[in-house]
Regions:
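N-terminal secretory signal peptides
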Residues: 1-2
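Extended non-globular scaffold/tether segments
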Residues: 207-211
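N-terminal export signals
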Residues: 5-26
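Intrinsic disorder/low-complexity segments
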Residues: 231-258
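Short amphipathic alpha-helical heptad-repeat segments
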Residues: 212-217
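Conserved catalytic cores of very large enzyme subunits
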Residues: 27-205, 229, 260-264, 268, ...
Length: 792
């Protein structure tokens, strides 16, 4: 019998022994845009490592004998809430009980197929806590505690596309440097130092902390059970498939790998039950436990998994020196670690940091960085996404490795440490050490390591004032604006007003964050919150507590304003009223004019002086209403240049605009040009962004750049890509990311999706499989690829 056959049959026997991989089937269809695993068929009986890793967070792989399923948890949570209301207990106590109930009651498993545990709450879109903290509790608290004018104006603006706003609980990162040294027992001891018995604030945290330790105990117990089952499996199978011998030495040798994995997993959990991480594997396990307890059980996205190489290197080097691990084992653990989030397949991707600068000024990139990049490259996952910090000290090998991966569609963003430090010193009085420790979070937002609780609440639609001004002009008998300067001035006045109202509403709705959704884990992880009796997410970080308001459609607004100038005030082809009428019928009867405006080179992204200057004015107008103004959380407001998916959402709520865009179509995303209009090449695009003062958008200053494959070929292509990144950063840009395609390749992928199952494109701050995009989104990428210059 061959070794491979023995391995397959051993795994199959293990799976059969614990009966944990065969469950009721479910029919899957793509539910919506962020359903990224609809294509991945349910597996009735998982027998191999790769399938297990892929399906782990796409179906239930737990041992049902260990606890209850998600539907039962939902009922138990509802009963707990009802009991809490009936008794009049504090919501902080109730929320902690909800966390504890899940940690202590959900079914779990510890499989020999994986280096990390499994939990019943596998579907992030069907978490039992989700509806409670996202819908039920906000509705109850907001109706009771917010002024009527706030909710009325807030919801009205959301409906008509003026903005899109919500209470954000999706952006938190603990200070990993601190809690990694404490471990869970150390966090419990620190909590005890500040806790006041009988105070619901601290009593709730004690409940949650104890539940984390109980949850760890449950994993240990289940691991030992699985290890015992594996040891008891002493029969083997001969070439004919019959059970032939017991206690065979060959079976023992072949099973040693799986037994070793289980034993090391149990040992790691036991170490974490007693103290802080001691090995590189412990670090990964600690991050795993915190993340899934926070996001899947407590309802708070943990938006960074640390600067992985910075944190792992000292542990890995010590492990190798002591003979505790091998590079091969470490690589396998890393693969399994990355696949946890590859399996979850969060549409927005899960951020991981990499690189940076040491205290002595040398680079953080090292031998462990290379291993991590190798494993990431081999996995070829859309998520986790790597938010890489680069600087003049970044070594050539790292540039070449990462840029080669980027041109092959790996999920990488390049953040300039120098421009980010400049913005942080201006707005946060950050020191050099603060800047060195900046953590990359979310899509690609830099934050202080001890203040990474910035919310992204409001998204302002830059096109809506233009739409409304033209609609008003269409109804007006008298021309309301005599020249373009007066039209522009009114636009800027309205943009400033909308931004200010967005800020004022946000100020009110963030007063109740702690009442809506108390953060158990983030509070326990933050000493300042414990000392000051504040919620770790809502307002309890020693620094940070900031609020980002995001700009949507900057480039398209520039294009639309210039189109008004050309059509009405320069060429006088239509009156303002006439142009408004054309917009009201979605360009019907004026296709020739629409195409001319759509194809005009007078657009943001082509280094047109007038477009550049107008962009500067729009950014200044927006930023002046936000930057440095106090929020209600003890921090400040920040203007932000990225817009997540709101360029589509708000585009659907916005009528036709004079730049050639039709009603409902997407607008520009981040600081990038409108899809398909940047025809003058990469140099012109970088120069466009350099024209603006990047410090005006301290939240982030991102550029999505599409390049033709011919630009990126070979060693010359890598040098060209590096030059683009370095010039962008020297000009003050914060983050740049690449999509490298030809229109021909994308058209073929659209026609033959079966040939491109793993093709990824960059959407905004994340990668998405091409086959998960709608045809409309695909067409937009093809249009832009058609116009991308093949040189500089």
């Amino acid at each position: 019998m061959t070794r491979n056959r023995f391995l397959r049959e051993l795994i199959a026997a293990s799976a059969a022994a614990y009966g944990g991989c065969s469950f009721a089937d479910s029919v899957r269809r793509q539910k919506n845009y962020d359903d990224t695993t609809w294509w991945d068929a349910y597996v009735e009986n998982i027998m191999d490592v790769d399938t297990y890793l892929r399906r782990k967070f796409r179906q239930d792989v737990t041992d049902r004998a260990t606890g209850v399923d998600v539907e039962t948890l939902k009922k138990l949570l509802a009963e707990t809430i009802a009991a809490g209301k009936a008794s009049g207990e504090s919501w902080r106590i109730t929320k902690a009980k909800l966390f504890a109930l899940q940690a202590e009651k959900m079914s779990i498993d510890v499989s020999p197929l994986d280096w990390f545990p499994a939990i019943a709450i596998w579907d992030r879109d069907d978490r039992p806590i989700f509806k409670i903290t996202k819908i039920d509790r906000p509705r109850e608290v907001n109706a009771k505690m917010l002024p009527a004018w706030v909710t009325k104006e807030w919801y009205a603006g959301n409906r008509d596309g003026t903005w899109n706003m919500w209470q954000d609980f999706d952006h938190s990162v603990p200070d990993w440097r601190v809690i990694m040294k404490l471990g869970f027992p150390g966090m419990k001891a620190r909590l005890g130092k500040y806790a006041v018995k009988g105070d619901p604030f601290y009593d709730g945290l004690q409940i949650a902390m104890d539940a984390m330790l109980t949850g760890t105990d449950r994993f240990i117990e289940q691991g030992k059970k699985r290890l015992g089952e594996l040891d008891a499996r002493h029969e083997t199978i001969d070439e004919g498939g019959d059970i032939k011998t017991k206690d065979a030495s060959l079976v023992s040798r072949l099973s040693s790998h799986f037994r070793n994995r289980l034993a090391k997993e149990i040992a790691s959990l036991e170490r974490l039950r007693e103290g802080p991480p001691q090995t590189a594997y412990d670090v990964m396990m600690f991050v795993w436990l915190y993340f899934f307890w926070s996001e899947h059980l407590d309802g708070f996205q943990c938006r960074s998994l640390t600067e992985l190489d910075v944190f792992l290197t000292p542990y890995y080097d010590a492990d190798i020196a002591a003979g505790r691990t091998t590079e091969a084992e470490f690589r396998e653990q890393l693969k399994h670690f990355l696949w946890q989030w590859g399996s979850v397949a969060n549409y927005w991707n899960q951020p991981v940091g990499l690189g940076g600068t040491k205290k002595d000024g040398t680079t953080e990139f090292n031998h462990v960085s290379k291993i991590i990049l190798d494993v990431m490259d081999e996995c070829a996952l859309a998520t986790p996404k790597f938010l890489v910090k680069v600087a003049p000290n970044t070594p050539d090998w790292a540039w070449e490795k990462m840029l080669d991966m980027a041109r092959r569609h790996r999920s990488l963003s390049f953040t300039g440490e120098v421009p980010v430090a400049k913005a942080f010193k201006k707005w946060f009085n950050a020191t050099d050490d603060d800047c060195r420790k900046i953590v990359m979070t979310g899509c690609y937002e830099p934050q202080l390591h001890d203040g990474a609780n910035r919310t992204g609440v409001g998204h302002v639609n830059f096109l809506k004032p233009i739409e409304r001004m033209l609609a008003e002009a269409a109804r007006s008998v008298i021309a309301p604006y005599q020249d373009f300067d007066s039209f522009k001035a009114e636009y800027l006045r309205r943009l400033a007003h909308v931004t200010a109202r967005c800020r004022e509403i946000t100020f009110e709705i963030e007063k109740v964050l702690g009442e809506v959704n108390p953060a158990n884990l983030m509070t326990i992880a933050t000493e300042h919150a414990l000392r000051t009796r504040k919620d770790g997410f809502a307002d309890g970080c020693p620094r940070g507590n900031d609020t980002a308001i995001l700009a949507v459609g900057i480039a398209t607004a520039v294009d639309a304003l210039l189109a008004v100038k050309e059509i009405v005030f320069e060429r006088k082809e239509l009156s303002l009223s006439g142009l408004g009428a054309v917009m009201s019928v979605n360009w019907e009867g004026h296709e020739e004019l629409r195409l001319r405006m759509l194809r005009s080179r007078r657009k943001w992204g082509n280094n047109d002086p007038e477009a550049n200057a107008l962009g500067v004015e729009l950014i200044e107008c927006f930023a002046s209403q936000l930057n440095g103004r106090p929020n209600s959380r003890g921090g400040i407001f920040l203007a932000c240049g990225h817009c997540a998916r709101q360029y589509i959402v708000l585009g659907e709520k916005t009528g036709a605009t004079p730049d050639g865009r039709k009603a409902g179509e997407e607008m520009s995303k981040n600081l990038s040009p409108t899809m398909g209009v940047d025809t003058e090449g990469a140099t012109a695009l970088v120069a466009t962004l350099a024209a603006s003062d990047v410090a005006k958008l301290p939240g982030d200053y991102p550029l999505d750049m599409m390049l033709h494959p011919s630009v990126c070929q070979g060693e010359k292509g890598l040098k060209a890509m590096r030059s683009i990144v370095e010039v962008f950063h020297r000009n003050g840009g914060a983050v740049i990311q690449f999509t490298v395609f030809s229109a021909e390749e994308l058209r073929d992928a659209q026609k033959h999706p079966e040939k491109y199952e793993n093709l990824q494109v960059r959407v905004c701050g994340w990668n998405v499989r091409w086959n998960d995009l709608s045809k409309t989104e695909q067409d937009a990428y093809i249009l832009r690829a058609e116009n991308v210059m093949k040189g500089f």
